[in-house]
Amino acid sequence: MPIFTAQELAERFNLQLFGDGNIRIHGVATLAQASPEQLSFLANPRYLTQLLNSRAGVIVLHADDVKAASGTVLIAKDPYVTFAKIATLFDIKPAREAGIHPLATVDPSAHVSPTAHVGAFVSIGARSSIGASCIIGTGSIIGDDCTIDDGSELIARVTLISRVRLGKRVRIHPGAVLGGEGFGLAMESGHWIKIPQLGGVVIGDDCEIGANSCIDRGALDDTVLEEDVHIDNLVQIAHNCRIGAHTAIAGCTGIAGSAKIGRYCLLGGHVGVVGHLQICDNVVITGKSVVRNSIHTPGEYSSGTPLTDNRTWRKNAVRFKQLDMLVRRMMAVSKEKA
């Protein structure tokens, strides 16, 4: 594990140091759990009490909070972002030896860079290409006509079914499936006819896709994630969707086919997005919301019923069913008075 002094961290990240610059930091932790050899941070005033009782050797915080700290501190404009950058210094991953594991299966027409790592029980299909310094983790399946650009990582048991293109430095977590058939059906004489899904999936540079998430290939056009999109676990992105750059989508969200999500959007957990609509740039959708119409104005949007005690909720539910009747009565009374 690397060790840094407070002074070294201040210089590396251009931070203002107050206190002992010679304190040696071995890792990072929360305010409540940090030891004198660890660094922590304060980004939310609600944790000021924890700051007062923290044993952390160094604390990253905003200039407005420096008077509340008694030990060594690093002043940052955005303590949360700064902490994230410092934490990466301690996130040391074991090196993977380049080469193809003897228990992997690679089609003769596929290309694997000599600097890539291909783990055990990996299968790579026809005409697929693995770029330089890629890591293809144990049990991953790469189908035909897939391309993985330099520096990307499939952690383990990732499936790229067919016609999937990954950009540079893409990271995909276990259980994710990309390039599955989109849910396309046409009804004829009381029976469903399956519509062939002839498109692909395109993932931009620096994207991350969480465990057990699914991104379906397009029917005709590709399903696209632009650069620096971050997808949490258990997210479903249907065929022909397009997700704009720098957008983040939290777990259990479902996006129906052909929806277009703008840049710098944030979708909370368990959001539902109806198909064939558009969400403009810089939109925040709070958790459990359902987006039924296109959004053309940036801002924060919510839907659903807030949590309350069960007794109150049941009363409100009964009154909700009576709203139409009550409105009609009010309109009738207004007409009588007029």
UniProtKB/Swiss-Prot annotation:
Keywords assigned by UniProt, alphabetized: Acyltransferase, Lipid A biosynthesis, Lipid biosynthesis, Lipid metabolism, Repeat, Transferase
Gene Ontology cellular component terms for the protein in this record: membrane
UniProt EC number: 2.3.1.191
Active site residues per record: H239
Reactions catalysed according to its record: a UDP-3-O-[(3R)-3-hydroxyacyl]-alpha-D-glucosamine + a (3R)-hydroxyacyl-[ACP] = a UDP-2-N,3-O-bis[(3R)-3-hydroxyacyl]-alpha-D-glucosamine + holo-[ACP] + H(+)
Pathway named in the protein's UniProt entry: Bacterial outer membrane biogenesis; LPS lipid A biosynthesis
BP GO terms, sorted: lipid A biosynthetic process
Keyword Oxidoreductase among record annotations: no
HAMAP family named in the record: LpxD
Family membership noted in the UniProt record: Belongs to the transferase hexapeptide repeat family. LpxD subfamily.
PANTHER family, per database record: UDP-3-O-ACYLGLUCOSAMINE N-ACYLTRANSFERASE (PTHR43378), UDP-3-O-ACYLGLUCOSAMINE N-ACYLTRANSFERASE 1, MITOCHONDRIAL-RELATED (PTHR43378:SF2)
Protein name: UDP-3-O-acylglucosamine N-acyltransferase
